[in-house]
Amino acid sequence: MEEGKQEASMPLVPIDSFSYSWLVNFPSLEATIDDHHQTYEDSSSSSSFIEMDPRLPPSRRFFIKTSHESSFKFDNFVSFSDEDHSLVHADELFRDGYVMPYRLKPTSAATEEESEPLDTTTSEKIDTRGLNSKPSPTSSRKLRRVSKWVLLKYLDFLTPLCKRLRRCRSAVTTGSIGMDSRIRVTTSCRSRVYSDEMTSSPRISVADDYYWRRSCDSESSIYEAVLHCKKSFEK
């Protein structure tokens, strides 16, 4: 009873409203939709194969036509020509789940150029030209000037160096000559003193003889050291 009272209390939909007119004209709208659907099928049956039925719920509204239900091959709709490289078959790009590199096929003109043998006469001519070509006089003059300039630079560097080496050698030789003369003078003086002592006193103690031999050994060692240094400088 309460539900009946609530329905009676609800206001009725006015006749001029859009919802009321749409409900009244629903069969005619359905017929026009069917006609439009049929004309669309006739006009685009050759190009499209997925159709929509507005009367079905959204989950089942799209369906595939029977002529293409079991066919998923798109080769009939796309043409792969040998000359057009913008379209490539999927089998050439994908293999075992990996993307493979695609290389463009060479055209007929490129293959003909690669297959043509090289002209041996032209290559021989080029080789003979390279061998027979003589250097120009200007280039030879430039080379001579450069070589002369390099030699002059080397001479400017070597001449002062040679002068310095000569000065060093002359200084070393004069120093060694002076040392030799000094050693000779000292040895001669000592020998004279020793000879005088021998003549004056015929008896010489053993200690004096030992010290004299020791001094002679030291002088001879010094003389040998000086000679060794002199030889090393000369080398």
Curated annotation (Swiss-Prot):
InterPro entries: MAKR6 (IPR044699). The keyword Cell membrane applies. Residues 108-140 are annotated as: Disordered. Keywords: Abscisic acid signaling pathway, Cell membrane, Membrane. Residues 130-140 have a biased composition (Polar residues). Its main location: membrane. It is found in: Cell membrane. It comes from the Eukaryota. One of its GO terms (cellular component) is plasma membrane. One of its GO terms (biological process) is abscisic acid-activated signaling pathway. May be involved in abscisic acid signaling by acting as a kinase regulator. This is Probable membrane-associated kinase regulator 6.
